[in-house]
């Protein structure tokens, strides 16, 4: 069985991974899909979440691309 301090450390590590990697990735995917179709209040929420998850955005954003899809001519 794990000691209390080990469980606390694992909990902190899990929360750090969730805050710095998982939630910013999911949020960036959501913003990519909804940006052109969202209303004013939804964009306010998006801006708030960008500020809230800013450290994770700095870590995750360089690995994502938001280039437009190629057009068919």
Curated annotation (Swiss-Prot):
Coiled-coil intervals, chain numbering: none
GO-annotated cellular components: plasma membrane-derived thylakoid membrane
Single annotated GO MF: oxidoreductase activity, acting on NAD(P)H, quinone or similar compound as acceptor
Superkingdom, taxonomy of origin: Bacteria
Transmembrane segments: 7-27, 44-64
Keyword terms: Membrane, NAD, NADP, Plastoquinone, Quinone, Thylakoid, Translocase, Transmembrane, Transmembrane helix, Transport
Top enzyme category: translocase
Signal peptide interval: none
Membrane topology: Multi-pass membrane protein
Reactions accelerated catalytically: a plastoquinone + NADH + (n+1) H(+)(in) = a plastoquinol + NAD(+) + n H(+)(out); a plastoquinone + NADPH + (n+1) H(+)(in) = a plastoquinol + NADP(+) + n H(+)(out)
Pfam families cross-referenced by the UniProt entry: NdhL
Known EC number: 7.1.1.-
Disulphide bonds in the chain: none
Keyword match Hydrolase: no
Localization: Cellular thylakoid membrane
Function: NDH-1 shuttles electrons from an unknown electron donor, via FMN and iron-sulfur (Fe-S) centers, to quinones in the respiratory and/or the photosynthetic chain. The immediate electron acceptor for the enzyme in this species is believed to be plastoquinone. Couples the redox reaction to proton translocation, and thus conserves the redox energy in a proton gradient. Cyanobacterial NDH-1 also plays a role in inorganic carbon-concentration.
Family statement drawn from the similarity comment of this UniProt entry: Belongs to the complex I NdhL subunit family.
SUBUNIT field: NDH-1 can be composed of about 15 different subunits; different subcomplexes with different compositions have been identified which probably have different functions.
Entry protein name: NAD(P)H-quinone oxidoreductase subunit L
Organism field: Synechococcus sp. (strain JA-3-3Ab)
């Amino acid at each position: 069985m794990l000691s209390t301090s080990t469980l606390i450390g694992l909990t902190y590590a899990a929360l750090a991974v969730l805050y710095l990697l998982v939630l910013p990735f999911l949020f960036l995917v959501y913003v990519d899909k909804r940006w052109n179709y969202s209303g004013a209040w939804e964009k306010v929420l998006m801006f708030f979440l960008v500020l809230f998850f800013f450290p994770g955005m700095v870590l995750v954003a360089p690995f994502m691309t938001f280039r437009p899809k190629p057009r068919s001519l």
